[in-house]
């Protein structure tokens, strides 16, 4: 066989000319050490702060410490298979989670992956977990109510849409119960709720999901769970992931409510990560930026104006404001609200609801201390009728507490003081409410109206709650138009008051309420 050298050289030249080599540029590094979920990597000179890194076995990590000759990263999940000498790749992306309506009704982990066994979530949209909060110009003042359905909160410590209201108290004082009531009460209002469980037992989270399902609240709720058994990194990220999911609705001119249960455990997880990364510890061994950890999260809860919504939706949604309301929960130790994390979060939020162990054990539930609980912006958002009728409640309770303290030393009390004490006792009793028995505006207004006009003056304290319940049922059946009118207008007309006065007279004559 004759070989033609010219032919061969032509073939080789043609191959060389047509050769296309697409060079993929990727920064790679080598694992130096792995300890407690923290990986030190050599050679990732181009890594960004907060960038996602890819480890062998499709495991993701987060670049947190950018040092001169190494990068300190935290692994998001299992790290037992990562070993010294493994190759790590930069992804060039900041950590993102899936967002969208498809998440509603589902239970997901801190990275937005479904963990409820109901199959994959079909959403194509993702958003970064870390975002800059809306600026002053993009915001609108809080002037719409976020009804919790709890008499004590809606009358004395009102929450508005776009507000951050802290729920603070010791363990086992009913903090989660208050937050769950607020979520259940949003049924039928169009408000989407996000419940972020941080560092809780998996059994507790399963119980919360079951209760929400029982009360039909999962239809408007997303549950983001980072259990106590998961990596500290996931417990640290979970609140930001939940916030991103809530911002999706806020930026489209809708209203959302997010509960962080609880931020004390997030701070502990962040402290663990920071100490393992050898960052210098400060007060209570927390790192220096623990205030920023919570402030950058809670500042993202806001009410944004129409222009901002229009800009974010590219003109699709016009004339609508969006809001994200936050109810962060903080657990105190033996009622110490002057500890580092509680004082930080109190200073960031727009008010706080203090829950006390003594009140809880005395059977006053929700165990709210009305004296030191405040809402700094909610007053402007309160419904007219509740604002008008609820004004005397806080005063009555304050006077009652003061007189109750003095009456312990006084043997004989004058008639006026005795009446005031009795009134205070009745008000305290009527502020009690069972879990998942939320009231709408009209039902709450009815109770407050009855307190204000002295209808309970001849009702024994022990029978006050039963009297309230029976009277509500009576009005629901005999005068439903009054409740409908109050719910529709948010105010109580003179005509409605006259109808209620007649109804109260008729009810008292037929109901055996006296001891």
Swiss-Prot record:
What chemistry does it catalyse, as a reaction equation? ATP + H2O + 4 H(+)(in) = ADP + phosphate + 5 H(+)(out)
Site entry: Required for activity: 373
Q: What PROSITE patterns has UniProt attached to this entry?
A: ATPASE_ALPHA_BETA
Q: What is its main location?
A: membrane
Kindly report, in one word, the top-level EC class recorded for this enzyme: translocase
Please, which domain of life does this record's source organism belong to?
Bacteria
Where do the annotations place ATP binding? 169-176
The record, for Pfam families, names: ATP-synt_ab (PF00006), ATP-synt_ab_C (PF00306), ATP-synt_ab_N (PF02874)
Q: Name one GO molecular function term.
A: proton-transporting ATP synthase activity, rotational mechanism
Q: How does it sit in the membrane?
A: Peripheral membrane protein
Q: Name one GO cellular component term.
A: plasma membrane
Partners and quaternary state?
A: F-type ATPases have 2 components, CF(1) - the catalytic core - and CF(0) - the membrane proton channel. CF(1) has five subunits: alpha(3), beta(3), gamma(1), delta(1), epsilon(1). CF(0) has three main subunits: a(1), b(2) and c(9-12). The alpha and beta chains form an alternating ring which encloses part of the gamma chain. CF(1) is attached to CF(0) by a central stalk formed by the gamma and epsilon chains, while a peripheral stalk is formed by the delta and b chains.
Summary of the function given for this chain in its UniProt record:
Produces ATP from ADP in the presence of a proton gradient across the membrane. The alpha chain is a regulatory subunit.
Task: Indicate the family of this protein.
Answer: Belongs to the ATPase alpha/beta chains family.
Q: What is this protein called?
A: ATP synthase subunit alpha
What is the protein's species of origin? Neisseria gonorrhoeae (strain ATCC 700825 / FA 1090)
């Amino acid at each position: 066989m004759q070989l033609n050298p010219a032919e061969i050289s032509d073939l080789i030249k043609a191959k060389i000319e047509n050769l296309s080599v697409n060079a993929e540029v990727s920064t790679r590094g080598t694992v130096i050490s792995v300890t407690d979920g923290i990986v030190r990597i050599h050679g990732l000179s181009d890594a960004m702060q907060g960038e996602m890194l890819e480890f062998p076995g499709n495991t993701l990590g987060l670049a947190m410490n950018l040092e001169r000759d190494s990068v300190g990263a935290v692994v998001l999940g299992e790290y037992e298979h990562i070993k010294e000498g493994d190759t790590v790749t930069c992804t060039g992306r900041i950590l993102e989670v899936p967002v969208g309506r498809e998440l509603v009704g589902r239970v997901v982990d801190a990275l937005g992956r479904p963990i409820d066994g109901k199959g994959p979530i079909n959403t194509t949209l993702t958003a970064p977990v870390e975002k800059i909060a809306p600026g002053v110009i993009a915001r609108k003042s809080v002037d719409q109510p976020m009804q919790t359905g709890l008499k004590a909160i809606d009358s004395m410590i009102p929450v508005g849409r776009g507000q951050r209201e802290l729920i603070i108290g010791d363990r086992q004082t009913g903090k989660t119960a208050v937050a769950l009531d607020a979520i259940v009460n949003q049924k039928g209002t169009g408000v989407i709720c996000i419940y972020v469980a941080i560092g809780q037992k998996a059994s507790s989270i399963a119980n919360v999901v079951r209760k929400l399902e029982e009360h039909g609240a999962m239809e408007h709720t997303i549950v983001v769970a980072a259990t106590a058994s998961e990596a500290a990194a996931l417990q640290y990220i979970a609140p930001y992931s939940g916030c991103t999911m809530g911002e999706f609705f806020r930026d489209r001119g809708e209203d959302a409510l997010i509960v962080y249960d609880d931020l004390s455990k997030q701070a502990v997880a962040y402290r663990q990560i920071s100490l393992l990364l050898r960052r210098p510890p400060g007060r209570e061994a927390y790192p220096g930026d623990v205030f920023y950890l919570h402030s950058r999260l809670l500042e993202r809860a806001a009410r944004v104006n129409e222009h901002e919504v229009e800009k974010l939706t590219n003109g699709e949604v016009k004339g609508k404001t969006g809001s994200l309301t936050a109810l962060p929960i903080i657990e105190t130790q033996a009622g110490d609200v002057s500890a580092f994390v509680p004082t930080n979060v109190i200073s960031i939020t727009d008010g706080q609801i203090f829950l006390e162990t003594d009140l809880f054990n005395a059977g006053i539930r929700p165990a709210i201390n009305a004296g030191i609980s405040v809402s700094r912006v909610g007053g402007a958002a309160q419904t007219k009728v509740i604002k008008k009728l609820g004004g005397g409640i806080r005063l009555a309770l304050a006077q009652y507490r003061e007189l109750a303290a003095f009456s312990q030393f006084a043997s004989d009390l004058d008639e006026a003081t005795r009446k005031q004490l009795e009134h205070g006792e009745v008000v305290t009793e009527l502020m009690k409410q069972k879990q998942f028995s939320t009231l709408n505006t009209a039902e709450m207004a009815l109770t407050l109206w009855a307190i204000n006009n002295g209808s309970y003056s001849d009702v024994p304290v022990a029978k006050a709650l039963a009297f309230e319940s029976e009277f509500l049922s009576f009005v629901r059946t005999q005068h439903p138009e009054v409740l409908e009118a109050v719910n529709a207008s948010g105010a109580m007309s003179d005509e409605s008051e006259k109808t209620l006065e007649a109804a109260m007279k008729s009810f008292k004559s037929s109901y055996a309420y006296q001891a």
